[in-house]
Structures are given as C-alpha cells and as structure tokens.
Amino acid sequence: MSLSNKTVKELRQLLKERYTVEDELTESIALSSMRFKPSQEPEFHALSQSSLLKTKLKQQSSTDIPSYTHVLISKLSCEKITHYAVRGGNIEIMGILMGFTLKDNIVVMDCFNLPVVGTETRVNAQLESYEYMVQYIDEMYNHNDGGDGRDYKGAKLNVVGWFHSHPGYDCWLSNIDIQTQDLNQRFQDPYVAIVVDPLKSLEDKILRMGAFRTIESKSDDNSATSYYELETIIFDSELNRALFETKLNLHCVIEDDESEQISLNRLIDSMKQYSYLMDSKNVRTRIKLATTSERVSNENKKNIDYQNRSTRSQFCLNTQRGDSTETSSFGSMFSGDNTSDVDMEDRNLTEFDSTDTSLCINGEPSIHVNRVERSSRSTDNFHNSKKRMNSNQERCHDEGNDMLQRNVLETDYARAKNRILASKIKQYERLRFYKDTFTL
C-alpha cells in the first residue's frame, strides 16, 4: 500500500475506514471535546470577561449581605478543574477558587490545586497545604509590591471558594463537606464550594459540575445546616473566542510510544504462540502416526498367529477324524457277523472291549480350543474397535482446540498489526499535513 501519492484527506479517510480503534476516553480527548452547559438566561448571553471586570470596577461597596444565587466561572477555570480532577483519577483532589463578587453573583476567574492527601472518598488539607496556599496567593495575585502579579484590569482577585472532586458518585456535599463549607462561610464569606465528577464527565463528555453554599435552617429546638445549589454559568474571554474562530481545526494526537511498543510486543507474542502451536501439532501428528503404525503391525501379527492357530486346529481335527475312521474299521473285524470263523461268545474281554472310545476323548479338546480362539478373536476385535473410536474422538477434540487457539491468535495478531499500522499512518498523516501547510 503506497501512501506517498495520497493526500491528507485520503489518509484521514483511510484511518477512519480501516484502522479505527475504539479506545477508552483519555485525558486529552476529555479536555478537547468537553461540552459546557450554555446559559439559559437571556441577560447572560453576552457575558464576557471584560464586561464582568468593567462592572466590578463600577460597583460601589454595599453593607447589605447579598443572597448569592449564581456562580459565574471562566472557561479557563473549568478546564483547570477538569484537568486536575481527571489527572487525579479515582482519588479526590482539592483546590482554591480565585475571583470576586458582583451583586448576587460569585465570579470565579482562576483557580489552582493544593498538595493534599486524598483517598477515593475523602480529601484532607494539612498544615503544609495552607502554607502553600498563602505563598502561592502572595506570589501570583499580590499587587501591593508591584511584582509580577496576574493583572485582571485592576480588579483584585481574592479567595472566593474551594473545589474538590467526587470520582464516580456525582456532585453533592457530604456531611464533612457541609461542615467545611459552613465553617468557611462563617469566617471568610463570600465562599462557594464547587464539586466536579471527572469519571461521569469523561463518560458523558459533558462537564458534570455543581456549585453549593450552606444555609442554616432554624427550628424550635435545634438548628441544622443544609445546603443549596447555585446556578453555574460559564463565560469566556474575547481573546479566546477570536482565537477559537481563527485557529486551525486540527486534533493533535498525543503520541504514545509505550502504546506502540505494547502493540509490537503483543504482535511478537502472537507470532511465537502460533509457531509453538504448529510445532506441538506436528509433534502430536508424528506420535499418532508412529502409534498407529505400531498398532497396525501388532494387529497383523495377531491375524497371522490366529491364522496359524486355525490351520493347526483344522489339521488336528482332520487327523483325529482319520484315526476315528480307522478305529471303526478295525472294530468291525471283531463284530458278531455270522460269516466270521471266530467264536465271540467265549472270548475274554481284552483291550479292544473298552467302553471308552478314543474319538470322543481326542475330539472334545480340539473343539473347545477352537471356540476359545474364536471368543478371544471377537474380544480383540471389540477392543480394537473401541480404541479406534476413542482415538477418533481424541483427534476431533484436539483439532477443535487447535482451531480455536489458532483463531484467537490470528485475531490478536490482526488487531496488533492494525494498531501498529494505524499509529504509523497517523504519524505520516501529521507530517504530510505540516509539509502541505507550511511549504511555500
């Protein structure tokens, strides 16, 4: 298959038709194809980062404590939170939200993660985490010393909340989360808690995120703390929008050398196993041929022995029949015939007057031997037939197992081969695209 004459479009079509491999979602796919929930409020349709900053600068201080109902979060913060959560996997992560307040809205402009110790169901911030947070905010967001702080057009960013992940069990606040959020709201309000579910976000390709605040519900005897969810609205910068409209629509595939090496190892293993399977089959075939030849030789010997025994038995039987005839002829000489000159009445019993006959004595053993040989021959035939039937069943069973193993190995070989070819064609397609794009 020659690829030098194919265009980039044809290469992509070839990859789509022949070498598409259904893999699990990865971090790069999640961040590049994640869809964000659009705003349903008409007043927020024209929302942008610059408009929020201008409104913040014009806002006058008020002593009234607002009831926050909306969280405005930048797309940059959403991507950062998603990146941290996906990288954490099944382990919970935690971070800090930076922004400001605007009327009854909490605006999140940026965020950063904290070095915490997390498990699959809990995350704890230790003393080192708080020290890191203070130093990071002082270095990155402090404008008093005229350092290289992040400039948001004069709007100072403060800590407005925290975020953490719930891998696989949706967005809500647990009892510990409610206590943590209530404590922060009491001492540094405004404060909001954002929860993200990275696993369901990867599965649905939609950002699963929720913003929550606690509220104290008073009753007659005791007071209980509950929480409510704020509406989350995502905004973007005009610079990002312009870049998005003018950028090349190119999906950059992250090259994974380990994945290609794994496919190559699987290909080699499949070839080795297939060769071993064929060698084992040939060895079994040679053993069966040798066993069959030996069995046929033994059967031929048994047939020859049986024929020899049958011939000897027939010869003995014929000989005994001849002796019996002579004995009868000899006895007729002493019979009571009227024409005989010998007087039979006065003679004494001699050896010829025995009541036993040699014909019966000599004839019965030969008939018995013949019957035993026939019975033995029938038994041998039955056992030979049974052995042949068992050998046929074993051969069919071995052939079925060999065919099944061969099909599995051929499938693994084809899959590994296609993955390697797809990886090489993707590399060539990117190089060809760069050449066609940047060559004058």
UniProtKB/Swiss-Prot annotation:
SMART domains: JAB_MPN. It is found in: Cytoplasm; Nucleus. Residues 319-341 have a biased composition (Polar residues). One of its GO terms (molecular function) is metal ion binding. Its cofactor is a divalent metal cation. Zn(2+) binds at residues 164, 166, 177. GO terms for cellular component: COP9 signalosome; cytoplasm; nucleus. Pfam families: JAB. It is an enzyme of class 3 (hydrolase). Residues 71-218 form the MPN domain. Keywords: Cytoplasm, Hydrolase, Metal-binding, Metalloprotease, Nucleus, Protease, Signalosome, Zinc. Component of a COP9 signalosome-like (CSN) complex, composed of at least RRI1/CSN5, CSN9, RRI2/CSN10, PCI8/CSN11, CSN12 and CSI1. Within this complex it probably interacts directly with CSN12. Also interacts with RPN5. Catalytic component of the COP9 signalosome (CSN) complex that acts as an regulator of the ubiquitin (Ubl) conjugation pathway by mediating the deneddylation of the cullin subunit of SCF-type E3 ubiquitin-protein ligase complexes. The CSN complex is involved in the regulation of the mating pheromone response. This is COP9 signalosome complex subunit 5. The gene is RRI1.
